[in-house]
Amino acid sequence: MALFNFQKPDKVIMIDSTDFEGKFEFRPLEPGYGLTVGNALRRVLLSALEGYAITSIRIEGVDHEFSTIPGVVEDVTEIILSLKQVRFKRQIEDIDNESVTIAISGKNQITAGDFQKYISGFQVLNPELVICNLDSKVNFNMEMTIEKGRGYVPAEENKKQNAAIGTIFTDSIFTPVKNVKYAIENFRVEQKTDYEKLVFEIKTDGSINPKDALTEAAKVLIHHFMLFSDERITLEADEIAQTESYDEESLHMRQLLKTKLVDMDLSVRALNCLKAAEVDTLGDLVSFNKNDLMKFRNFGKKSLTELDELVAIKNLTFGMDLAKYKLDKE
């Protein structure tokens, strides 16, 4: 249904943009829509985008986070607070995490930049950040893990079973967006002056540029709002009242389509891409066509070839109509 005389922008205007800061205008908007759109995008920008951070460390001679290190000015808690601020940008396409062993000696001060030569898959974006001050005679040996994540994750959620003795799990700030501001200004269209202009200012850590950050945030919102389209809205009471019967072939297909992808022999990279897109089962997978899959973040041709083979082996096809299998019902 067309929206009668509904004023909406036809594009986003980029006023200024670097790798770290960007300013954007969205106009004209109907009265009240500046706040509606601005607040939603700001929340997603600050909490839902993926980034990279340290999730655990292991320092030689240290048993827990309340320890002190002989010859080092800062205690371990202060060192952890500094490590939480180190920002990373992925340098190698297929890497989402990396375990790093660091051995530094002969220095009075260690900065984040000193880690770079020990890291192969990521670039340190704030090399000037001071990690600790120490006696130059002290050897500083540490292992740390860099991982991909979203938003803020507390140390408790980063914990893994069977971790080595002395491993300290840290809080992780994955979000690549440092700050978001938006302002709503009056905007004139012909003789009407009560329309709105939404102005966004976005600052990132450099691992993603502001334009891409805004695009990714919009995609997150679109993915959620699509669920409210007519074909996705059903009346639960009607569904419960319906009685259904399935032939043997349909039952077999339902069972197959509900198979979890983690139970398939897929590469970690393919699984991570699908998980990020909330594609959990074979049914979820084949509901997309190949062009849709290629739009997933970090999804490449190798992953598509791998999934193409899996779908063919299972005698399925991409873009299948799954409605008759009623996968949303037990």
From Swiss-Prot:
EC number, as in UniProt: 2.7.7.6
In the record, what terms sit under GO molecular function?
Answer: DNA binding; DNA-directed RNA polymerase activity; protein dimerization activity
Q: Give an example GO cellular component term for this record.
A: cytoplasm
Q: Which InterPro entries match?
A: DNA-dir_RNA_pol_insert, DNA-dir_RNA_pol_RpoA/D/Rpb3, DNA-dir_RpoA, RBP11-like, RNAP_asu_C, RNApol_insert_sf
Q: Which GO terms describe its biological process?
A: DNA-templated transcription
Reaction catalysis annotation: RNA(n) + a ribonucleoside 5'-triphosphate = RNA(n+1) + diphosphate
Q: Where is this region: Alpha N-terminal domain (alpha-NTD)?
A: 1-231
Question: A single Pfam family, by name?
Answer: RNA_pol_A_bac
Name the UniProt key words of this record, in alphabetical order: DNA-directed RNA polymerase, Nucleotidyltransferase, Transcription, Transferase
Q: Where is this region: Alpha C-terminal domain (alpha-CTD)?
A: 253-330
What role does this protein play?
A: DNA-dependent RNA polymerase catalyzes the transcription of DNA into RNA using the four ribonucleoside triphosphates as substrates.
- Print the domain comment field: The N-terminal domain is essential for RNAP assembly and basal transcription, whereas the C-terminal domain is involved in interaction with transcriptional regulators and with upstream promoter elements.
Q: Quaternary state and partners of this protein?
A: Homodimer. The RNAP catalytic core consists of 2 alpha, 1 beta, 1 beta' and 1 omega subunit. When a sigma factor is associated with the core the holoenzyme is formed, which can initiate transcription.
Family recorded in the similarity comment? Belongs to the RNA polymerase alpha chain family.
Q: What is this protein called?
A: DNA-directed RNA polymerase subunit alpha
Protein species of origin: Flavobacterium psychrophilum (strain ATCC 49511 / DSM 21280 / CIP 103535 / JIP02/86)
Q: Gene name? A: rpoA
